[in-house]
Amino acid sequence: MFALGALLDPITSHAAPAPFEPSAAGSTLPNRLTGSFVSAARGGVKTNWVIALPPGQKAEAGSLRPVIALHGKDGDANMMLDCGVEKALAQLVREGKPPFAVVGVDGGANSYWHRRASGEDPGAMVLDELLPLLSSMGFDTTRVGFLGWSMGGYGALHLGAKLGPSRTAGICAISPALYTSFTASEAGAFDSYDDWVQNSVVGLPALNAIPLRVDCGTFDRFYFAARQFVSQLKTPPAGSFSLGGHDIGYWRTQLPGELAWMAT
């Protein structure tokens, strides 16, 4: 997805990120960076981030682009590491694929990555705080990718569409937590019927103009909703509906192919 290069206007930041706290320096070219910042969009909450770098790469060159990895319910910034991101990035380097970084960030246990009635807005945290922070660290954020698991799969679709086709290089939604109705949604996923309607990803024009990949197991509880979502797209997305459930085992087996797709 990062081969789709173009000169793009940078996003306008509505709130500059608070100073981040980088981890202690390790090797000359570390494969992992960690830190945190206080997110105004999340109500002043300390927000941790983790960056997985492909071996031999660094952000300072200004050419490394990020894929934002959004965790599922009750997860955190480290979920992408549990899914095997570092091993998959190393494999891409061995195969000579274009390198990119994968960035995990805390979004809240049950936030569903959109503005809530409480005022907390993890989506704004990603777009208005995290992306400018990554830019200040030397990453090329003119175009970024999104991927996510479960709640984060929905979030990847939601935030990728919100950022728009000019900035979003690709979206990979893995076992996305999609609901065919408000009454079918999990308690706490949306604040009200109006909240569900306003933040639905079905029928969004932007998602027909952004490269998409959707993977979901046939035994996943979100299988039918994911099928319905895919069926209403103008162009069939990449990905597959294959044997598997809503679990880390399925996500680990799918990740190498998903990151290889992001690299194309």
Which role does the model predict for each range below?
Residues 2-264:
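Non-catalytic cap/lid and distal C-terminal segments of serine-dependent acyl enzymes
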